[in-house]
A protein has these predicted regions:
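Surface-exposed loop/interface segments of Gram-negative outer-membrane beta-barrel transport/assembly proteins
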Residues: 1, 15-21, 29-140, 156-207
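An active-site-proximal structural segment forming one wall of the substrate-binding cleft
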Residues: 153
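Transmembrane beta-strand segments that form the barrel wall of outer-membrane beta-barrel proteins
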Residues: 9-13
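Residue-level recognition of beta-strand termini and adjacent short loop/turns
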Residues: 37, 148-150
């Protein structure tokens, strides 16, 4: 018989600084066949993968990170260290007790433009206001048997299958950047998906 196996690992940190857009995947492939007798051969082709992804906002009601990168004005700093530096609307929101987010790595406020009010705001704010991830397992393969009871005739029975399971979670906190970029609510969502597919084929060839 013959046996082949391979293992592959991918760890892609994405284009956004930090760990908010990552893709990790561990996958394996097994191909094998064995001649049980002169007239029957069995085999399998099987692959399995386990993946884990985290992503940043690409679209949505409150802007997205990539638009924020392209539209924020060049005069706005990345951070404000003190509320006295805030734009007027941001100062008002701060005085009203709105949640002005800080970067958890340095304790500084995300800066917001004093010249432009749009629904995108600071790219780092778009990056950090939501935590979301998706993880799952995929299993797919084929089992087969080739039966040759006499010369020139082959009967094949083949069973193909695919099984998938995934879970996704997302969590957002209240925040304020400007009159268009804000949320007063916590948001939590979760979903689970399971699917399976199979196909059984039987056919014969005679040459």
């Amino acid at each position: 018989g013959h046996f082949f196996t391979s293992i592959n690992y991918v760890n892609n940190d994405g284009i956004v600084r930090g760990d908010k857009d990552v893709y990790k995947r561990l996958s394996a492939q097994i191909n094998a066949d064995y001649k049980l007798y002169d007239w029957i051969t069995v085999g399998t082709n099987t692959s399995i993968e386990n993946y884990n992804t985290k992503s940043v906002s690409q679209h949505g009601r409150y802007g997205n990170l990539m638009n924020a990168v392209m539209t924020i004005d060049p005069l706005t700093p990345v951070y404000y260290s003190d509320p006295s530096q805030f734009a007027n609307t941001m100062k008002q929101a701060y005085d009203e007790g709105k949640n002005i987010l800080k970067d958890p790595t340095n304790g500084l406020y995300y800066a917001t433009s004093k010249y432009i009010d749009d629904d995108n705001g600071n790219p780092l704010l778009q990056r950090d206001k939501t935590d979301s991830y998706n993880r799952g397992i995929n299993l797919r393969g084929t089992l087969y048997a080739n039966i040759t009871p006499f010369k020139g005739f082959t009967f094949t029975s083949r069973f193909g299958y695919r099984v998938a399971q995934s879970n996704s979670h997302s969590y957002s906190v209240p925040y304020y950047a400007n009159k268009q970029t804000y949320s007063d609510e916590y948001s939590i969502s979760a979903s689970a998906n399971n699917s399976w597919y199979y196909q059984w084929e039987n056919f014969a060839n005679y040459n």
